[in-house]
């Protein structure tokens, strides 16, 4: 993904670029720091670095089991490594998870200090850690007011504990969804891809979004077996409603103004579900679903302008 954003650097001028998120278990923090510094130079100071351990289901596919290995301590250590390497260009460090002796780099970022943000979904400890040490928290798939409040409150606790002003940090939420003038295809598409995310969502997050883990267990088991079509058949329609924002521009405006902003979030990240994504993931087509470009333009024209005003 870093290569993709590097390619986009010369074709953009204002948008900030970076993967959401980069995994510090699968990739060494010093390598991540060098990629971030290089992208920052290519973009003239527009690089984003959001790091995480990734979800446990993904790591298991790589044969890695993090249970019982103190992932929060790993995140804290990775943050220290990246902060030092980006600021000084060299590092000597002997930690529990990472060790370096005389390591240096010529890759230097434009932004100083370089902002480093933490990605987290389960919480609350990762949310608190972000408030304590990072420049922000990027969470994902928090749709209900309960889920949003839970995240924001834990983030604030961490900031308060460290004597930091949480309002000066970047609190963001990545929401999955689709936008269209006709809400029917948008809702159908969102259900398809929301079902795919079930296996990556911890039970606690499902419950905070009003989803009973037992109710969706059959669909999750089908996904684990690789039976996508059966999983989609077993996923109840309520999953699409609870785990996405889908419909007309007004539906998006309502979600942002009534829930996201009041909970304290100042940054929205959106993963739009387009025909290509539905076809590649589920092997189906949905009549009337706008393309990605059409959804982006509709969102910019109708939603961003309304919220900004």
PLM features per residue range, with description:
Residues 1-309:
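Active-site-adjacent structural elements that line small-molecule/cofactor binding pockets in enzymes
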């Amino acid at each position: 993904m870093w290569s993709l954003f590097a390619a986009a650097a010369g074709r953009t001028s204002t948008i900030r670029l970076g993967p959401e998120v980069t995994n510090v278990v699968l990739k060494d923090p010093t390598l991540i720091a060098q990629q971030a510094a290089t992208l920052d130079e290519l973009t003239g100071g527009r690089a984003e670095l959001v790091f995480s351990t990734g979800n446990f289901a993904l790591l298991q596919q790589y044969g890695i089991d993090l249970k019982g290995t103190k992932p929060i301590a790993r995140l804290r250590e990775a943050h220290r490594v990246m902060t030092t390497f980006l600021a000084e260009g060299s590092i000597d460090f002997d930690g529990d998870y990472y060790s370096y002796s005389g390591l240096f780099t010529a890759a230097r970022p434009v932004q100083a200090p370089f902002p480093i943000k933490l990605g987290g979904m389960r919480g609350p400890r990762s949310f608190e850690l972000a408030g304590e040490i990072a420049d922000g928290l990027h969470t994902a798939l928090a749709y209900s007011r309960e889920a949003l409040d839970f995240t924001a409150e834990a983030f604030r606790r961490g900031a308060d504990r460290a004597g930091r002003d949480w309002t000066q940090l970047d609190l963001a939420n990545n929401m999955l969804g689709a936008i269209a003038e006709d809400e029917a295809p948008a809702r159908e598409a969102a259900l398809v891809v929301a079902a795919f995310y079930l296996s990556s969502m911890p039970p606690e997050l499902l419950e905070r979004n009003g989803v009973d883990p037992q109710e969706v267990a059959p669909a999750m088991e089908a996904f684990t077996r690789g039976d996508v079509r059966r999983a989609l058949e077993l996923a109840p329609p309520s999953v699409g409603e609870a785990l996405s924002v889908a419909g007309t521009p007004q539906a998006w405006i309502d979600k942002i103004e009534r829930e996201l902003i009041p909970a304290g979030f100042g940054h929205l990240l959106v993963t739009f579900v387009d025909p290509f994504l539905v076809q590649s993931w589920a092997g189906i087509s949905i009549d009337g679903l706008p393309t990605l470009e059409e959804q982006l333009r509709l969102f910019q024209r109708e939603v961003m302008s309304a919220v900004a005003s």
